[in-house]
């Protein structure tokens, strides 16, 4: 009994399976050949579909080839006459019909001149308002008139098969167009067509060339899962609302040049087997190619982007060109999961622009993407863009480390295993703030100016302003004026440089202030609190090598006077009597910071407060870090010094 029941269930399942898969063939078998008599019957008895009066021409075989001249003439004349005579909009339903021969829409619709005078007698105020959205609409009747074919009612082409050429050029659809699963066997012409309502071409199959150039979609355009097997042309088309081209396939060149997209343009999961051309187009909102595949080179040259451009999980087999394109502050190129699946796969763009535009949300899962992007720009010798990608990589790494520190467990906190992560995070934060990971020379230069000016002024202060009583040891007013003025000018120039070049200038200035101000300030306050009562009060703490005056590179020297007597005799203190002696303190600071100067400056080792010695060594240590950062940044930003170009 159980075996019998199983057998019955198996037969039912097999029956249902074949029933479902035979529905399309049954639908084809149900098609009835259209005759003149049947045409008249259908025209005399329109049906009500979705609230609209519709001429029912569904499930027919409509033979309007030149060999069937009588039916061809009657077909166009009677349908057009019925539409023209109707006071209310009439829809056309060709669903599941097979149309043989060329299909010419202008012989079916209502011929309408786009002038205010003509529309007032032909259409309702609502329809007239829709037509006025056309850019060719003329309010002045003295200008040349632009004529269109108007379909006032909905046009249904669901599963319609067109065996010949289709011509919907210069056609204005005032109601919805439904062409789901329609098949266009030969060329289809939609040049300068207008869609006032939703245009649905879901799962449409375009076997021949399709031309939507200069068309306007005033409502949603839905081409989801459509298949374009020949040349596709949307040149100069205008999409006012959302456009859905997701899961579409393009077997040959697709021309979307000079198109205008006011809302979202969705090309996710699309397949481009030939060249996609989007040059000189304008995208005011989201443009997504998520999970798309580009088998040939794509062009987005001279395009304008005002929203997110998503290349997430895209597979590139050839280059994509963004040269001369504009990315506004609201736009960026998201490349999370981007795969370079060929040696020819590249992203092209303007130097210093495309690297800035690229965006990735996280480091996790995108390490390979970032390496490929760096290799991509280095192979193109676009060092600034390669450095920008590496800078963004380190920013993402910093965010990852910071998040890791924020989620420290109690056990790790007690065991101090977080210290290494903390030091790594702090050092990385410093690199990002002071040099953008060695990619911004202007930022490093501005930082150096501030450090150089600060310590020059600090050394002048502790050396020249020693005490007020009983015998004052202070500089002249002229010297004070020169030093303060020069310090302000140098510091402001460094700050201005940072404000211009840093991504987060306030944080950068804060980091510099934390390095320069707290510790030296505490030590200077302590120095003046204690007072100075040692010998040699009338002599400078800083000595110069007077044996020669020349520009010197003194990387290996230490800031203390030599011990050997013959060498010590060459060093003399700064002369306070000369009016320009304040410049020596800047030379000292430059020497201590960059190991470069016009004199070899040292600090004396007799009658020297320990605080002053510490401050000199403190700047010397900062100088080691700074000169390393400077050389590293120069090696990454000057192409001739960047050997990594040649070492992939």
Name each region found by the language model.
Residues 2-648:
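Terminal module of membrane-associated proteins
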């Amino acid at each position: 009994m159980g075996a019998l029941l199983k057998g019955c269930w198996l037969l039912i399942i097999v029956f249902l399976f074949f029933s479902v898969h035979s529905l399309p063939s049954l639908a084809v078998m149900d098609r009835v050949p259209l005759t003149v008599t049947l045409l008249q019957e259908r025209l005399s008895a329109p049906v009500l579909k979705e609230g609209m009066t519709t001429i029912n021409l569904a499930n027919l075989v409509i033979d309007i080839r030149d060999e069937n001249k009588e039916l061809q003439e009657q077909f166009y004349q009677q349908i057009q006459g019925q539409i023209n005579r109707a006071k209310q909009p009439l829809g056309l339903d060709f669903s599941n019909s097979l149309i043989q021969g060329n299909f010419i829409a202008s012989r079916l619709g209502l011929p309408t001149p786009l002038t205010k005078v003509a529309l007032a007698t032909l259409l309702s105020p609502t329809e007239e308002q829709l037509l006025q959205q056309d850019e060719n609409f003329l309010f002045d009747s003295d200008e040349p008139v632009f004529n269109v074919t108007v379909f006032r009612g909905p046009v249904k082409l669901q599963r319609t098969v067109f065996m010949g050429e289709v011509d919907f050029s210069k056609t204005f659809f005032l109601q919805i167009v439904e062409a789901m699963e329609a098949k266009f066997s030969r060329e289809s012409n939609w040049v300068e067509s207008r869609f006032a309502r939703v245009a649905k071409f879901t799962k449409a199959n375009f076997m021949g060339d399709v031309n939507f150039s200069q068309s306007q979609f005033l409502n949603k355009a839905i081409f989801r899962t459509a298949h374009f097997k020949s040349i596709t042309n949307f040149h100069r088309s205008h999409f006012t609302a959302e456009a859905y081209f997701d899961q579409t396939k393009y077997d040959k060149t697709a021309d979307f040049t000079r198109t205008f997209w006011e809302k979202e343009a969705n090309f996710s999961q699309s397949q481009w087997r030939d060249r996609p051309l989007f040059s000189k187009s304008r995208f005011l909102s989201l443009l997504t190619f998520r999970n798309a595949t580009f088998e040939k080179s794509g062009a987005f040259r001279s395009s304008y982007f005002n929203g997110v451009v998503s290349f997430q999980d895209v597979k590139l087999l050839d280059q994509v060109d963004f040269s001369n394109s504009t990315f506004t502050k609201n736009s960026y190129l998201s490349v999370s999961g981007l795969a370079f699946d060929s040696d020819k796969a590249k992203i092209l763009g303007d130097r210093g622009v495309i690297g800035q535009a690229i965006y990735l949300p996280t480091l996790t899962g995108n390490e390979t993407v970032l390496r490929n992007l760096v290799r991509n720009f280095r192979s193109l010798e676009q060092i600034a863009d390669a450095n920008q990608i590496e800078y963004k990589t380190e920013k993402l790494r910093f965010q990852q480390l910071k998040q890791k520190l924020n989620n420290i467990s109690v056990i790790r906190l007690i065991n101090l295993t977080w210290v290494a992560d903390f030091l790594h995070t702090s050092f990385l934060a410093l690199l990002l703030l002071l040099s953008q990971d060695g990619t911004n020379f202007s930022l490093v230069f501005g930082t150096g100016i501030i450090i150089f000016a600060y310590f020059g002024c600090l050394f002048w202060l502790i050396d020249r302003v020693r005490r007020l009583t009983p015998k004052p040891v202070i500089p002249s007013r002229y010297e004070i004026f020169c030093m303060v003025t020069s310090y302000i000018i140098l510091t402001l120039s460094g700050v201005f440089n940072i404000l211009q070049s840093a991504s987060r200038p306030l944080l950068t200035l804060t980091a510099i202030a934390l390095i320069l101000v707290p510790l030296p300030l505490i030590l200077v306050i302590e120095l003046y609190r204690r007072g100075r009562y040692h010998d040699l009060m009338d002599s400078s703490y800083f000595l110069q090598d007077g044996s020669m005056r020349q520009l010197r590179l003194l990387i290996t020297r230490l800031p203390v006077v030599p011990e050997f007597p013959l060498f010590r005799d060459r060093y003399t203190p700064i002369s306070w009597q000369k009016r320009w002696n304040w410049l020596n303190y800047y030379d000292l600071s430059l020497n201590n910071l960059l190991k470069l100067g016009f004199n070899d400056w040292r600090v004396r080792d007799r009658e020297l407060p320990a605080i002053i010695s510490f401050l000199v060594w403190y700047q010397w240590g900062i100088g080691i870090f700074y000169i390393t950062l400077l050389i590293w940044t120069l090696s990454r930003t000057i192409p001739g010094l960047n050997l990594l170009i040649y070492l992939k």
